[in-house]
């Protein structure tokens, strides 16, 4: 049996028979809140039952804990503009819509004005408007609405055969007889360095939960459908089928570095993972965070508080002298012998149709990525 969800109980706020007839007011969600609504409803964000009230918001921003004391590192908020805020009152039940359809309701317990400057500095460690998370934070509404939600309709899925709720993955892991499961978060294609880390972790646990994020990302990130095809090709050719489970993570990317690493681990705990891989600059962007800052943040919490074991890995690479993958812990050779490419450089190569070296990425994966990006470009999709 997999370990307990965060907070002890897997939250279920789904009621598809909810009677909406008397609910008149509505809030139109953006992509971030739309994904958060469903993840709260299905228990992905357990123990959270709704969008944050000011008490939880302030506590998480300042202390990385809910008001109850439970560890939680990112504020899950419902921003609205001042015009919409003026229509709302504490005690209202309000529809949550996206694209004109109702997906949930919120029972408003709090309406408050956040200190976004403080939120940026605490959560993102910067208020630089060039940071994609900070830019998004300041572009959203300046009033936050808090209260428990009910998910009345689930969104149609881009990848239905790879979409699972926490209850589904927990059941699957149990049926497979897996007692220890390591989660791996990614918004990028899986290159040889990631493969090496995953397989090293897989040597010590029963199963790998490859859980790529398919929510909103930066415009220059590889599109989710292209990435999904590349993951399938990689798993088919290079991984033991009975040791890996592929499922998508619906959330938007925050690019909050260390804090987002904690968040990613806690969510995977809810999906049934016992371990979580934390690599270099996890959930980072640009040079805003230290290479191993995310790994260090895990040390601020006790094992009991987190309830999931971080597996910390150094930057890995192919060493031409060793003739295999390694890290600074296992390879004695100089950087000149290491095949290292930045994510930006690889994206440039792929978009130009240039094959990165086989030591960096599996050729089957590269073919899928080049073809997929070319098709997107021809269709006018970035």
UniProtKB/Swiss-Prot annotation:
Its EC number is 2.7.7.4. One of its GO terms (biological process) is hydrogen sulfide biosynthetic process. It is an enzyme of class 2 (transferase). This is Sulfate adenylyltransferase. It catalyses: sulfate + ATP + H(+) = adenosine 5'-phosphosulfate + diphosphate. Keywords: ATP-binding, Nucleotide-binding, Nucleotidyltransferase, Transferase. GO terms for molecular function: ATP binding; sulfate adenylyltransferase (ATP) activity. Belongs to the sulfate adenylyltransferase family. InterPro entries: ATP-Sase_PUA-like_dom, PUA-like_sf, Rossmann-like_a/b/a_fold, SO4_adenylyltransferase_pro, Sulfurylase_cat_dom, Sulphate_adenylyltransferase. The gene is sat. PANTHER family: PTHR43509, SULFATE ADENYLYLTRANSFERASE. Gene3D superfamilies: HUPs, Sulfate adenylyltransferase. Pathway: Sulfur metabolism; hydrogen sulfide biosynthesis; sulfite from sulfate: step 1/3. The keyword Transferase applies.
